[in-house]
Every structure is written in C-alpha cells, then in structure tokens.
A protein has these predicted regions:
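C-terminal substrate-recognition regions of SAM-dependent nucleic acid methyltransferases
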Residues: 153, 196-197, 203-393, 492, ...
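Short, flexible, solvent-exposed loop/turn segments with mixed acidic/basic and small polar residues
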Residues: 27-28, 52-53, 282-285, 406-410, ...
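Short His-Asn-centered micro-motif
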Residues: 64-65, 83, 358, 394-396, ...
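Intrinsically disordered, low-complexity coil segments
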Residues: 26-34, 91-101, 246-247, 266-275, ...
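Short, charged, surface-exposed secondary-structure boundary motifs
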Residues: 91, 197-198
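S-adenosyl-L-methionine
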Residues: 1-11, 16, 20, 37, ...
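SAM-dependent methyltransferase catalytic region
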Residues: 1-187, 192, 204-225
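Residue-level detector of functionally special positions within alpha-helical transmembrane segments
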Residues: 84, 112, 245-247, 252, ...
Length: 540
C-alpha cells in the first residue's frame, strides 16, 4: 500500500549501475572527493549497492525510507533511517535544516524517488517545511530534487532517475530552478519500458550544486528505440550506448529557451538551422484564437448522477473504485461498466450531430465521423460559435503533427484543438497555415525542441507547444500561391509526390540551403518505422 501511495518503483541493477557510473564520472571530472553518499528513498538499496561498487568501501552510505519493511531488509548492509524524507515525523522546522543536523556532510546523492502525482502531503505543511516548487500540478520527485539541492554541500553532486515529465510545461519552474542553481552535468532520456510494468519514460539527470557559468556544459543523450530494444534483451549496456551517442551542449542554451526547455535532441551544429527556421515567425496570439471542443473523452463514455441527473466523465481510478463524486451536487455516483453510457457513436440518430474526435484528424484530411447528442445536461459543449467554419483542427494526442481544415461546422471533442482567425476580416487562405503546420520543416523544429521522436504511451501537443511553432507570415507572393494550391490538392486527395513537391516549396519559403534541407530529410528518415510518421520520410 505504501509503495502504491508514494509511487515507488524499485530500480533494476543494470540501471542502478548506469546511474552510479555517471555519478562517479561527474565527481572525477569536477575533482570532487566523495566520502558520503545518501539515497533519500533507498528502498531495496539497489542504488546504494551500485554506488558502493563505484566508489568503494571507504565511503559512508546512508539511506532513508518511509517503508519499514524495506528498512528492515537492508539495515544490516547500510545505515538506513526509517522516516519520511520529505516531511520527517514530529519535526517542526524545515526539512533540509533537520536533515543537515542529523546527517553528516553529504557529498553525493543518488536516488530513484517516488514518481507519484498523488498529493499525499498538505501544501501548507510543505511550504512551512521550506519547499518552494510544490505548486500546481507536480510529481513527488520534484520535492526530492529540491531537497537534494538543499542537502548537498557546495559542489556536491546528485544523480536522479525521474520521469520524462521533467520536460513537460508543468515543470517549467523545476527546470528554471535546476538551470539557475546547479550545473547540469548529464541529461539522459531513456524512454519507456526501462522499468517492468511501468508505462512512463525515464530520464537520468546529474547535477552539481554550483553556480553555472557561460561555459558550463551538459552531456546529452537519448536512448534510441533500437538501442533500447537491444539493452532490454541483454545485448548491450546503457553506459556503452551512452558513450556512443552522447553529445555536449552549453547549459546556457536551456536558460535562454522558452519555458527553460531542455532541448537535448538539438546538437550544437543544428542550432544555426533552428535559428533560421524560427526567425520571422507569426505571433500566434495575434493571428489565431485557440480553443478545444466538447469536454468529453473520445469514447464518449459518461455516467449520470442519480440525484441531479448530470452527465460526467470518469477516470480509470474511479472505474476501478466503482464510484465517483458528482461534480455538480456532490452525490456519490456508481461507476461501473453497467452504469457507463456512450454519448458519442459511430452511427447517427434523429437528434445527434457530427463531432470529430482525435483519431478523425489526419494530415490534410478528416477521416471518418462520429456523432454526439447535443443537449445532455452536465456536458460542456462550449460556445457553438467555436465550431463555425472554416477552422483549423489539430489533433492533440498521438505521435506527430496532424492538421486539417473543417468546412462543415462540426463539433469536436476535447482531443482536437481548434484555431480560428483572431481578426474576422483576415482573408488568408487557411490552406497556407495548413501546409506549414503539416510540413517537415515545422516537424523538424518540434522533434529537436521537444524531443517527441518515438512512440510513447501518452504523447500529446499543448497550446504552449503549438504557439512556439515557427510559422512564416503570409506574403501572398508566387511561392505562397503555389503552397496553397498544392495543399488544396492534398486536401482533395493525398498523394505522396505532391506532398514532397509541397515540402520543397516550403523549404524554399524558409530560405533553406541544399545542405540544410538534406539535414532535415536525414532527420525524418531516421524516425522509427511507425505508420504515424512514415509519410514524413523523404528520398534524398
């Protein structure tokens, strides 16, 4: 129960060894002597064992864990403290002050902290205990990272295994904290399936508690799909793949990025190309009004409150629990397969209207159609003017960028973003923006900036990401006219050769040289062999 509550997943030995080696290398490269190593969520002590192999028996190894069973199983091997690391029991002062008084000086911290997003701590208690990053939506590992920085001695080093939510917009404050207060030595994105039965991508981050300088460098690494398969099947080690594929960037780039984005997939020699692509872009908020459709899942499954009759969606946990609290009146609603009903269907009836869900939106076209009942109490259909045509539709979920134009006035679900002109007198053909949003040039920017270059369980676009897409202003010249004509042709019937012809025009629009075009093409051709992105590949 404790493991589920705290989001604990114990660390495979091979991953622990990888993290320990990175920690040791960082200590050696920065001439730091490591005498004391702490794991603040020690669990079965896989990371402390790996650290001991890396640093030897002369170091002191200390663990802290809230799980008494785990403490009892490991206390003979290491000094293990049974307590809650984040909010120590019966402690009235700040957590960092308490632990600094109880522990020896800490040279290094190695950890795979809990990843749970469940709020098990009272926010006011966290604030009183000195935590500054526990705001909005956050995972529990954020608290461990902040505490680690406060516990380490100056120039001390921490190496953490954390989820890829580090790169999400919700963690902008965490990235700012790390990029301003530490020297980020390593960021290694490992992807999914690193942990058995955990469908979340993992990242290893190694930081040193020191003020970064203009010359501070970060070693960046992404474990490719093929290398991950090899590693998981026992054909290679993480450190071998790391040594083969790593590259180095200036940490100062992260500080300058919008949202302090950790764009680790952008190599230094690609920065110039990206600066060309991102120059002279539209101001999204001045050009478009952004919205999304009916607040309902793509399946359209809802339950009805037996007290007030309001329909509402439900989460997987609520289905497992068999109940939920009504968002309107607070009554308990039974949530079972028998009580759930579909209000989105594939077949229309007399009072249903057309609605597009995410899977209907493809590049340049809308495929298929669904239907929804339009007057169900409790469902937020949004202002009907939002759906008036014409409008650009962008699929929220899935690998890649899928954009189409709707001229029918159909509703959409919340998994489809809607873009309409902010100026009602704007007569720019939407096909122009359609072409650029579906282009490989913009997709290259997306891959390099946000790193969404392979399948994962829950890929999705956000408004914040979309509003960074580098879209050149419409000039109405010959190139723009040809772009619109070819995009219109693709809307009528997709043809790969037309798609490639259009792409060459768009590359010309962005002023890319032949070498720069080939760099983008190579990146497209290196994408995984997945149906979602195979159309983006090009012959050189």
């Amino acid at each position: 129960m404790i493991k589920q509550k705290y989001g604990v997943v114990y660390t495979p030995d091979s991953l622990a060894q990888f993290v320990a080696v990175l920690l040791k290398r960082t200590a050696e490269s920065s001439s730091q002597i490591i005498r004391t190593v702490l794991d603040p969520s020690s669990g079965e002590c896989a990371l402390l064992n790996a650290a001991k192999k890396a640093f030897g028996t002369e170091c002191a190894y200390i663990g802290i864990d809230v799980d008494r069973e785990a403490v009892n199983a490991t206390k003979d091997s290491f000094t293990i403290i049974h307590n809650d690391t984040i909010l120590p029991q019966n402690v009235k002062r700040k957590a960092a002050d308490y632990w600094r008084g109880k522990l020896p000086e800490i040279d290094a911290i190695i950890a795979n902290p809990p990843w749970s997003s469940e709020k098990i701590y009272d926010r006011s208690e966290l604030n009183s205990s000195g935590y500054t990053l526990a705001s909005g939506q956050y995972d529990s590992y954020v608290l461990f990272l902040e505490l680690a920085v406060n516990l380490l001695r100056d120039n001390g080093i921490f190496a953490f295994i954390i989820p890829d939510s580090l790169f999400d917009s919700q963690n902008e404050r965490l990235r700012k904290f790390l990029v301003e207060k530490t020297c980020i030595r390593v960021i290694a994105r490992l992807g999914e399936k690193i942990f058995d039965e955990v469908n979340r991508a993992a990242t290893v981050i190694v930081c040193q508690k020191a003020a970064p300088t203009a010359d501070s460098e970060t070693i960046c690494f992404r474990l490719s799909t093929d290398d991950r398969k090899a590693y998981l099947s026992g054909n290679g080690t993480l450190i071998a793949f790391f040594d083969d594929k790593q590259h180095i960037v200036k940490q100062s780039r992260f500080l300058c990025n919008s949202g302090y984005n950790f764009d680790i997939d952008t190599h230094t020699d690609e920065e110039h190309l990206l600066s060309i692509i991102t120059s002279n872009s539209i101001c999204w908020k001045d050009t478009f009004v952004f919205g999304r459709g009916v607040e309902i899942s793509k399946t359209g499954k809802v339950v009805y409150c037996p007290n007030c009759g309001c329909a509402q969606g439900y989460k997987k946990k609520q289905l497992e629990a068999g109940k939920k609290k009504c968002v309107n009146c607070g009554s308990e609603i039974p949530v079972t397969n028998d009580t759930a009903q579909n209000v989105i269907t594939r077949v229309p009836d007399d009072d249903s209207v057309s609605v597009f869900v995410g899977e209907n939106i493809r590049r340049y076209k809308i495929s298929g159609e669904c239907y929804i009942k339009p007057h169900i109490e409790g469902i937020n259909y949004k202002n009907r003017e939002l759906y008036l045509p014409p409008k650009l539709l962008i699929r929220k979920t899935g690998l890649g960028i899928y954009c189409a134009i709707d001229y029918t006035g159909s509703m959409t679900s919340q998994t489809v973003y809607i873009l309409k002109y902010a100026d009602g007198n704007d007569r720019t053909p939407l096909e122009y923006y359609l072409a650029l949003l579906n282009s490989r040039v913009v997709y290259y920017y997306y891959l390099k900036t946000y790193g969404e270059n392979e399948w994962k369980s829950h890929p999705y676009l956000t408004k914040q990401i979309i509003y960074t897409f580098p879209i050149r202003p419409f000039n109405g010249d010959q190139i723009d006219t040809e772009i619109i004509a070819l995009a219109s042709k693709l809307m009528r019937k997709y043809d790969y050769s037309t798609d490639i012809k259009l792409e060459r025009l768009i590359m010309k629009k962005y002023g890319l040289t032949k070498d720069e075009q080939e760099l983008i093409i190579r990146e497209m051709n290196n994408l995984p062999n997945l149906g979602a992105v195979n159309d983006m590949k090009m012959e050189v």
